[in-house]
Amino acid sequence: MAGRISAFLKNAWAKEPVLVVSFSVWGLAIIMPMISPYTKYASMINKATPYNYPVPVRDDGNMPDVPSHPQDPLGPSLDWLKNL
């Protein structure tokens, strides 16, 4: 089986090297995101980054879910990124 595949690849490379290279690049483009550590860390950063940022509001003391200052740390932190 491996002999047939290698013979096919040698023949294809001899006749159409552009197609062989293009299919190889396509295969790497499909496989690399699954095995890349960049994908793992990018998804961790996206989970920790808020989608909506706090709007400055006048706090009357009855809003426990609104931070007193927009830069107050709330939610998941990115300390793991600093410790890489």
Curated annotation (Swiss-Prot):
Modified residues (N-acetylalanine): A2
Superkingdom of this protein's organism: Eukaryota
GO biological process, alphabetically ordered: aerobic respiration; proton motive force-driven mitochondrial ATP synthesis
Keyword presence, Electron transport: yes
Pfam families referenced in this protein's UniProt entry, alphabetically: NADHdh_A3
Cellular component GO terms held in the UniProt record: mitochondrial inner membrane; mitochondrion; respiratory chain complex I
Major subcellular location class: mitochondrion
Transmembrane segments: 19-39
Protein keywords: Acetylation, Electron transport, Membrane, Mitochondrion, Mitochondrion inner membrane, Respiratory chain, Transmembrane, Transmembrane helix, Transport
Tagged with keyword Ligase: no
Region ranges (Disordered): 59-84
Alphabetized InterPro entries for the sequence: NDUFA3
Cell compartment(s), UniProt: Mitochondrion inner membrane
Entry membrane topology: Single-pass membrane protein
Family the entry assigns: Belongs to the complex I NDUFA3 subunit family.
PANTHER family: NADH DEHYDROGENASE [UBIQUINONE] 1 ALPHA SUBCOMPLEX SUBUNIT 3 (PTHR15221:SF0)
Cited function: Accessory subunit of the mitochondrial membrane respiratory chain NADH dehydrogenase (Complex I), that is believed not to be involved in catalysis. Complex I functions in the transfer of electrons from NADH to the respiratory chain. The immediate electron acceptor for the enzyme is believed to be ubiquinone.
Subunit structure: Complex I is composed of 45 different subunits.
Protein name: NADH dehydrogenase [ubiquinone] 1 alpha subcomplex subunit 3
Organism of this sequence: Mus musculus (Mouse)
